[in-house]
Design a protein with these regions (language model features):
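Aromatic-lined glycan-binding groove of carbohydrate-active enzymes
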Residues: 137-174, 209
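Active-site-proximal loop/turn and secondary-structure-junction residues that shape catalytic pockets
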Residues: 4, 32-34, 72-75, 103-105, ...
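Conserved short secondary-structure transition element at the edge of the structured enzyme core
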Residues: 91, 158, 177, 187-245
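N-terminal binding-site loop/beta-alpha segment at the start of enzyme catalytic domains
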Residues: 1-27, 92, 267
Length: 268
């Protein structure tokens, strides 16, 4: 996304692509709407903000087009008609191939899709929501809506900020310092602890890692591609090996049955 490191993440990716990859073999996704500076056109989903940010992203990435452009959050200050028209124009221009949305309410996503369909504009193909074994509120409406519309699910935080990868009482620097993760997960610790322990039990049962069990659970839910942070090579290996883990219906029930409803987080 543009806001990650104020564009630095896009610049780093662009240099890596130039040195190590063929553009045709890579799928590049980025986001718009986050604040990139002061002023009315430095954030949000107005036509001007979208066009400016996409041009800036293309320059930082050093490419001619973006494969998937996400709107990072819903913009309550811009009519959705203006946003969808601008996004459609980007697709028509060839600067963007597909559109995605992230972290919003189901009624908002349905409205955006309706506006696009009514006007003959490009609709969203991907939904990037917050979804994992410790946060399953997307199952209430969004996941079913996407399934009905044929929209791919590409959830972020599939490992709950690492909580699903380690024993409950273990410690880490991120666990201590990640304030955003604490807001997301630290209000339901009693039930979350049981779920994490059960992930560990299933991992031992199949002689795999806890990460692989957590990702395999997502595969069982019809997810297309969980977004996994790959800061180390072994994390990529875990992601790949999770494809081979086949959970039974009993496993899935065991992992899910202690879940309790959570407050909605991430949409604002």
């Amino acid at each position: 996304a543009t806001v990650y490191g104020w564009g630095a993440s896009e610049e780093i990716l662009g240099r890596a692509l130039k040195d190590y990859a063929s553009r045709d073999e890579i799928v590049i996704a980025t986001k718009v709407s986050g604040s990139m500076g002061k002023g009315p056109n430095k954030s949000g989903l107005s036509r001007k903000a979208i066009m400016n940010e996409v041009d800036a992203s293309l320059k930082r990435l050093g490419v001619e087009y973006i494969d998937i452009l996400y709107i990072h959050r819903w913009d309550y200050n811009t009519p959705i008609e203006e946003t969808m028209c601008a996004l459609n124009d980007l697709v028509r221009s060839g600067k963007v191939l597909y559109l995605g949305a992230s972290s919003m309410y189901a009624w908002q996503f349905a409205k955006a899709q309706y506006i696009a369909e009514k006007n003959g504009w490009t609709k969203f193909s991907v939904m990037q929501g917050h979804y994992n074994l410790l946060y399953r509120e997307e199952e209430r409406e969004m996941n079913q809506l996407c399934k009905d519309m044929g929209v791919a699910l590409v959830p972020y935080s599939p490992l709950a900020a690492g909580r699903l990868t380690r024993d409950w009482n273990s410690d880490s620097k991120r666990f201590k310092e990640d304030k955003v993760a604490k807001v997301k997960y630290d209000t339901t610790e009693e039930s979350d602890k049981i779920i994490v322990e059960r992930v560990s039990e299933i991992a031992k049962k199949y002689n795999v890692t806890k990460s692989q069990v957590s990702i395999a659970w997502l595969w069982s839910k019809g997810v297309t591609a969980p977004i996994v942070g790959v800061t180390k090579e072994k994390y990529l290996y875990d992601f790949e090996q999770a494809l081979k883990v086949k959970l039974t219906d009993e496993d899935i029930k065991y992992l899910e049955e202690k879940y309790i409803p959570h407050n909605i987080v991430g949409h604002e």
